[in-house]
Swiss-Prot record:
It comes from the Bacteria. Keywords: Hydrolase. Its EC number is 3.6.1.-. It comes from Stutzerimonas stutzeri (strain A1501) (Pseudomonas stutzeri). Its cofactor is a divalent metal cation. InterPro entries: Nudix_hydrolase, NUDIX_hydrolase-like_dom_sf, NUDIX_hydrolase_CS, NUDIX_hydrolase_dom, RppH. A motif (Nudix box) lies at residues 38-59. This is RNA pyrophosphohydrolase. Residues 6-149 form the Nudix hydrolase domain. Accelerates the degradation of transcripts by removing pyrophosphate from the 5'-end of triphosphorylated RNA, leading to a more labile monophosphorylated state that can stimulate subsequent ribonuclease cleavage. The gene is rppH. GO terms for molecular function: mRNA 5'-diphosphatase activity. SUPFAM superfamilies: Nudix (SSF55811).
Length: 159
């Protein structure tokens, strides 16, 4: 499902623990790290996509997390030209994302990257809230900055 501007609707997931760290996931067989994210299917709400992607990519169920916040609007990034599939129709030039801030309420050992036949990640770790800005691929950096900045006020306060 690609919109008329060439952007694929998508959800981004920022999962926090009780001390305000975020889950940072390593893409399978790569030294590339990112937040979990995934496309929104036809007739699926962003929240429905969030829970489907959370389960597919991280192994968590709706009862394992609490939604703390969501970005107000869509945040967009363009793919580098080398990643645009120019022979695909409709042409996808990037992603438009709704970002969700979640708190893990279930046990940490419920995080599993290997529950699907085609896992996207093969590892994860907790990192400080702003750490991903310096690590994510360049073309996603501005969207990460905007999402983290907008959602930061809703981050659980450390006791």
């Amino acid at each position: 499902m690609i919109d008329s501007d060439g952007f694929r609707p998508n959800v981004g997931i920022i999962l926090t623990n009780d001390v305000g760290q975020v889950l940072w996931a390593r893409r399978i067989n790569q030294d590339a790290w990112q937040f979990p994210q995934g496309g929104i299917n036809a007739r699926e709400t962003p929240e429905e996509a969030l829970f489907r992607e959370l389960n597919e990519e991280v192994g968590l169920e709706e009862q394992d997390v609490k939604i703390l916040a969501c970005t107000r609007g869509w945040l967009r990034y363009r793919l580098p030209q080398r990643l645009v599939r120019t022979h695909s129709q409709p042409l996808c030039i990037g992603q438009k994302q709704k970002w969700f801030l979640l708190r893990l309420t279930g046990a940490e050992d419920r995080v599993r990257m290997d529950l699907t036949g085609k896992p996207e990640f093969d590892g994860w770790r907790w990192v400080s809230y702003w750490y991903p800005l310096g690590q994510v691929v360049t073309f996603k950096r501005e969207v990460y900055r905007r999402a983290l900045k907008e959602l930061a006020p809703r981050l659980p306060v450390r006791d």
